UniProtKB/Swiss-Prot annotation:
The keyword Ribosomal protein does not apply. This is Transcription factor bHLH78. The gene is BHLH78. InterPro entries: bHLH_dom (IPR011598), bHLH_ZIP_TF (IPR024097), HLH_DNA-bd_sf (IPR036638). Residues 307-357 form the bHLH domain. Keywords: DNA-binding, Nucleus, Transcription, Transcription regulation. It comes from Arabidopsis thaliana.
C-alpha cells in the first residue's frame, strides 16, 4: 500500500522502500502502478488519482485473480497456437478478459483509469468497426493514463510472463509475432506496431528484444562466430512471417557460403601464387647452381649434386677424360684388363701384371749376370795366354834371326877355310848346311801353329823326336853323298839355299 501511495502521488519514496520496490519484480501490482509514472502530464488532476486509489486496489485484486485463473487454465496445444498467430491470440484473450473485468465491475467503464468506451471499442467490438465518439472527459483520462499497449514495451512484464507455465508449455523457437493493429481512434496499438515474443528458456530470453538485453548473450554469440562463415542476420522479434525468416536465413546461408567460398578461393589462389613464387625461386637457384647437363656417356657426380661450379666441372671433365684415355692404354697393354669391368678390378689386374713383370725382370737380370761372369772368365784366360805366347814367339824369332846371322857368318868363314882347304873339310860344310835348313823349316812351322792354338807338350816332344830321327838319317846320307859328289856342285847348292 505504501508503495502504491508513493507511486500514485509521484513522490520519491525513501531509499529503503525504493530498493524494496526495485526487488519486487514478481508482483503484478508494482507493474500496474508503474504505469502512472509514465504519464506525460503528471501534475494535472493529481487529486483524481487519490480518489481512484481505493477503486484501483479493488480492481488490482480482481485482476490478479483473473490472471491467475488464466495462467492455471489449460490451453489446447494445436497448430493454431504453435506459431506467431497463437501468441497474438493469447495476448488478445488476456486483454479481452481484462476488458470484461472492467465491464462487470459496477459498470464503471474504466480499467485502471481507462474509460469503458475505449476498452469496449478495442476488444468488445469487431476490429474493423469505426471508433466510437469520445467526450472530453474520456479524452482527458486517456491523456492522463497509460494505454494497455505498455504490456509490450515493459521489459519487466516480459521477464515475469516468461516465468509462467502457460507461456512455456508451447514451443516458440524461431517464431515471430505478426503486427496487431487495434483501432482506437487514429492511434495504433504501439508506435512500432509490434508485440514482443516471450520465450520460456533463459537461453531464448536474449532473443526477446534488443532493449531488454543490449550487448548480452546475443552479442557474445555474434562475436564468437569465426571468420569465413556467413554473417547471419539477427532474429527480429517482429518479422512478418516465419517463412520470411526462413528464406532470409537461407539467403543469408547462401550468401555466407558464397562469401566463404570466395574467401576460400582467394586464400587458395594466394597460397598457389606463393607456392609458384617459391617454386620459381627454387628453380632459379637450382638453375644457377647446377651446371649444364653433360652428355649421356659421361655423368659428372659433383655437378649433378650441385657441388661444383661451371669452370670446375669443365676442368674436372677434361681431367677425367685424360685419365680414361690412359686407362684404355693400360687395358691394351695388360692382357687381363679387357675382360674385367670396373675400375677397382682393373686396377687390381694392372697391379698384378706389373708385379709379375718385375719378377720376370729380376730373374732375367740374375741369369744374364751369371752368363756374363762365365764369359768374362773365359775371355780373360784366353787373353792372358795370348799375351804370354806372343812375346815368347817374338823372342824366339829374334834369337833365330841372330842364330841365322851367326851361322851365315860362320858358314862364310868355313867357306873361306874350305876354299883354302877344300880338300880337308868338304863333308863338314855340307852337313852344316843340311842341318840348318830343316831347323829353319821346323821353326817356321811351329811358329805358325803357335798363332792358331797352343801346342801340347806331347806334340812338341814328338816333333823334336822326329826332328832328331830325321837329322841323323839325313846326316848319314849327306855324308855318304858328299864324299862321292863334286865340290863345285856343292858350292852351287849352298848359294841356292842361301
Amino acid at each position: 500500500m505504501d508503495n502504491e501511495l508513493f507511486m500514485n502521488t509521484e513522490f520519491p519514496p525513501p531509499p529503503e522502500m525504493a530498493t524494496h520496490f526495485e526487488h519486487q519484480q514478481s508482483s503484478s501490482s508494482a507493474m500496474m502502478l508503474n504505469w502512472a509514472l509514465m504519464d506525460p502530464n503528471p501534475h494535472q488532476d493529481s487529486s483524481f488519482l487519490w480518489e481512484k486509489s481505493t477503486e484501483q486496489q479493488q480492481q488490482q485484486s480482481i485482476f490478479d485473480s483473473a490472471l491467475s485463473s488464466l495462467v492455471s487454465s489449460p490451453t489446447p496445444s494445436n497448430s493454431n497456437f504453435s506459431g506467431g498467430g497463437g501468441d497474438g491470440f493469447l495476448i488478445r484473450e488476456l486483454i479481452g478478459k481484462l476488458g470484461n473485468i472492467g465491464n462487470n465491475n459496477n459498470n464503471s467503464g474504466e480499467i485502471y483509469g481507462t474509460p469503458m468506451s475505449r476498452s469496449a471499442s478495442c476488444y468488445a467490438t469487431p476490429m474493423s468497426s469505426p471508433p466510437p465518439p469520445t467526450n472530453s472527459n474520456s479524452q482527458m483520462m486517456m491523456n492522463r493514463t497509460t494505454p494497455l499497449t505498455e504490456f509490450s514495451a515493459d521489459p519487466g512484464f516480459a521477464e515475469r510472463a516468461a516465468r509462467f507455465s502457460c507461456f512455456g508449455s508451447r514451443s516458440f523457437n524461431g517464431r515471430t509475432n505478426t503486427n496487431l493493429p487495434i483501432n482506437n481512434g487514429n492511434n495504433m496499438v504501439n508506435n512500432s506496431g509490434k508485440l514482443t515474443r516471450v520465450s520460456s528458456t533463459p537461453a531464448l530470453k536474449a532473443l526477446v528484444s534488443p532493449e531488454v538485453t543490449p550487448g548480452g548473450e546475443f552479442s557474445r554469440k555474434r562475436k564468437s562466430v569465426p571468420k569465413g562463415k556467413s554473417k547471419e542476420n539477427p532474429i527480429s522479434t517482429a518479422s512478418p512471417s516465419p517463412s520470411f525468416s526462413k528464406t532470409a536465413e537461407k539467403n543469408g546461408g547462401k550468401g555466407g557460403s558464397k562469401s566463404s567460398e570466395e574467401k576460400g578461393g582467394k586464400r587458395r589462389r594466394e597460397e598457389e601464387d606463393d607456392e609458384e613464387e617459391e617454386g620459381e625461386g627454387e628453380g632459379n637457384k637450382s638453375n644457377n647452381t647446377k651446371p649444364p647437363e653433360p652428355p649421356k656417356d659421361y655423368i659428372h657426380v659433383r655437378a649433378r649434386r650441385g657441388q661444383a661450379t661451371d669452370s670446375h666441372s669443365l676442368a674436372e671433365r677434361v681431367r677425367r677424360e685424360k685419365i680414361g684415355e690412359r686407362m684404355k692404354l693400360l687395358q691394351d697393354l695388360v692382357p687381363g684388363c679387357n675382360k674385367v669391368t670396373g675400375k677397382a678390378l682393373m686396377l687390381d689386374e694392372i697391379i698384378n701384371y706389373v708385379q709379375s713383370l718385375q719378377r720376370q725382370v729380376e730373374f732375367l737380370s740374375m741369369k744374364l749376370s751369371s752368363v756374363n761372369d762365365t764369359r768374362l772368365d773365359f775371355n780373360v784366360d784366353a787373353l792372358v795366354s795370348k799375351d804370354v805366347m806372343i812375346p815368347s814367339s817374338n823372342n824366339r824369332l829374334h834369337e833365330e834371326g841372330l842364330q841365322s846371322k851367326s851361322s851365315s857368318h860362320h858358314h862364310q868363314q868355313q867357306l873361306n877355310i874350305y876354299n883354302n882347304n877344300s880338300q880337308l873339310l868338304p863333308n863338314i860344310s855340307s852337313n852344316n848346311m843340311m842341318l840348318q835348313s830343316p831347323m829353319n823349316s821346323l821353326e817356321t812351322s811351329t811358329l805358325a801353329r803357335s798363332f792358331t792354338h797352343l801346342p801340347t807338350l806331347t806334340q812338341f816332344t814328338d816333333s823334336i823326336s822326329q826332328y832328331q830321327m830325321f837329322s841323323e838319317e839325313d846326316l848319314q846320307s849327306i855324308v855318304g853323298m858328299g864324299v862321292a859328289e863334286n865340290p863345285n856342285n856343292e858350292s852351287q847348292h849352298m848359294k841356292i839355299e842361301l
